[in-house]
Design a protein with these regions (language model features):
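Active-site segment of extracytoplasmic enzymes that catalyze sulfate/phosphate-ester chemistry
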Residues: 1-47, 52-61, 91, 98
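Short glycine/proline- and charge-enriched loop/turn segments
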Residues: 11-19, 61-68, 103-108, 163
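Aromatic- and acidic-residue-enriched segments that line the glycan-binding/catalytic groove
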Residues: 56-83, 147-172
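A structural signal for well-ordered alpha-helical scaffolds and beta->alpha junctions
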Residues: 30, 79-80, 118, 122, ...
């Protein structure tokens, strides 16, 4: 069945979890749609975030690999499932100064940019698409932007301004899925929703 195939492939959830174990990464031998396209002579590109590999020691020296849990990891080319153009990272939530590995970078050669992650990724995607115009070869591009994600406040002020007057309580009215004001999660929602929308 489809369900047993999912678990055979070790996919145990479709969202991040603080209780998810390492060892559930997408297996290198799993055949993905990107592998199929690459085999059919597509040019393939991936830009953005992808929790593709689990961190391993010595951890990549980024802020989110210090402490109890390491999050960020480089993905070697043979594990990228056919994606040849690569501007990506495992996870990095400083959205106003993100970091990336390009297609040929070794594990210790990531770089930072002084631009909001989604804007940088959109610019790189536009460049990639424009570079394909003269080719008769088909292409596929995935752009996986991190925000909206914690560090909700890490969004350019011009986008925050669009939501500064949003009536948060009106948004919460008649919504049983939003926790009550005064509760931990209710307050978290109310404190972050404007920036979430700004992302």
């Amino acid at each position: 069945s489809a369900a047993s195939d999912v678990y055979k492939r070790q996919v145990v959830g479709n969202c991040n979890s603080q209780t998810a174990p390492y060892g559930v990464e997408l297996p290198q031998e799993a055949r993905c749609w990107s592998d199929v396209l690459k085999d059919m002579d597509y040019r393939t590109g991936y830009i953005g975030k992808w929790h593709l590999d689990s961190p391993y020691k010595p951890y990549v020296d980024t802020y989110n690999n210090h402490g109890k849990v390491a999050w960020n990891e480089w993905c070697p080319p043979e594990r990228r499932h056919g994606f040849e153009h690569w501007i990506a990272y495992g996870t990095y939530d400083y959205h106003l100064k993100p970091m990336y590995w390009n297609a040929t970078a070794p594990r210790d050669s990531f770089y930072y940019v002084n631009q909001w992650g989604p804007a940088y990724e959109a610019d790189r995607a536009i460049e990639y698409i424009q570079a394909q115009k003269e080719s008769k070869q088909p292409f596929a591009l995935v752009v996986s932007m991190n925000p909206p994600h914690t560090g909700y406040e890490l969004v350019p002020d011009r986008y925050k301004a669009l939501y500064k007057d949003m009536d948060v309580e009106a948004l919460c009215a008649n919504r049983p899925d939003i926790p009550a004001k005064g509760t931990e999660m209710g307050n978290y929602f109310r404190n972050n929703i404007r920036n979430y929308y700004a992302c």
